[in-house]
Structure formats: structure tokens, C-alpha cells
């Protein structure tokens, strides 16, 4: 039976620290590194090895997790790792960077016999503390299999998105939804506020109902975005979603008009909900266009 992989972790910030804390129990051992002594101290006290440099982590790890701020920091860390790591080492970048950055760094690493994975995460610091992150991994299938078990310390969903860069592309698509939804939430707050409602109560309603329905992810079950064929199982279901959505969006827009409040995202949603679901615009949208 093979010995457990030795794991290194570079970057003990808001996300990196709780992820690394979950790895303290990893049987292969954990070596950590951060430029801030106060970030490293709790790990040393908990029994982790501490390296005083990125190269020092490379010398002690078979898999190195990187959770630093941005593309520039990732490039600097990976450059130092690639000069010190033994062939066969896997470098997993958890930072959200440009997919092209991941592709470029993977080529550089491959020239030195190393494998780079882009492995961004979703779930935030609370998810990391609970071991409930989702990790989207781009890279070879063999490298993915090597990291799957240690990643399981801080994630309960680890997916192989495809080749290097695919993990980042999936994260960007996921976060597009996240921040468009945040923007829509601010529009909903403005409508509620203009109508004289308590927007903190609206927030409670949204969090309660999303916990039950699953939020936007509840409709993300098809394996393609093309228009739905007449005999497709999803046709009647998503037409029903469209009809409900168009009715409620239309009512919200009418309320906004009465309050002299512009709701640009709601207008776009009314126009694009049906086509986006693959079922075309419904009667409510067509009526509004023709009125």
C-alpha cells in the first residue's frame, strides 16, 4: 500500500487558513508557509511543519496547494516551486486566476516534470471550516486522482472539469451567476424599499426560500443550453417555470413603473428567461413587447 502523500500549503489567508486547518489531520503530514508569522503560528502549535520559504515547502511535499491573492502572486509562487520541487510533484492552484495564466504555468511546470492543476474553490470560508467546499479541478486525470483524497479534507464535492484551465473556466461561470444574482438582489431591495417595505425582512424571506428551493441552481439540470425538443422531458417543466417567472417579473415591472423606479435587470430577465431556458418567450413577454 502506498504511503499517504505529503501535502504542502502556501497562503494562510481568509480561505487558505481554514482549508489548511482541515488538512492538519491528513496522515501524510502538512507543511505550511506564509509571509506572516502570526498566520503560521497556530499551525506550528497544532503540529504542522513550517517552511520559511516556498522552496522549503516544495522540498517536503508531493502535493502543494497554493491559495494566494492574484495572478501575480500565483506566478511568483509557482516559479519558485518549479525550481525546487521534485519531478512528479503536483501543484494545485486554488486562487481564482485567469485560465490562460493556469495554462501558461502548466506548460512551464511540465518542462520540469511537474503537474499543475487549476483547482479553484467555491463555498467561502464557512464552507472551508466545515469541509463543505466544492473544488473544480483542471488538469490530467492522473493528477486529479492523486489530489482527490487530500482535497476531501476540506471539500465534499471535488470534480474533474477537464484539461488545465477548465477548473478556472467553471469557477468563472459559477461566479458570474453568483454576482449577477447579488446585483439582482440589490434591485429587489430597491423595489421593496420604494414600496415602503422592510428590506431586512425581504432578505430573511429570500434566504429561507432559497434554502428550500435551491435558488438558481434548481434549474441547472440539463446537459445543454440548446432549445428544447418537443418530446423532451424538460419541455413542460421549464415552460411552467417560464410562465411563472414571466408573470411575476411582469408584475414587478408594473409595480416599478408605478413607483417610477427603473428595474433594468428585471427587464432583461423578462426578455431572456424563456429563451435562456430553451423554451422561447411566453405570452406575457410577447404581450409586453406588442403593447
Where are these regions (language model features)?
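Rossmann-fold NAD(P) dinucleotide-binding segment
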Residues: 54-115
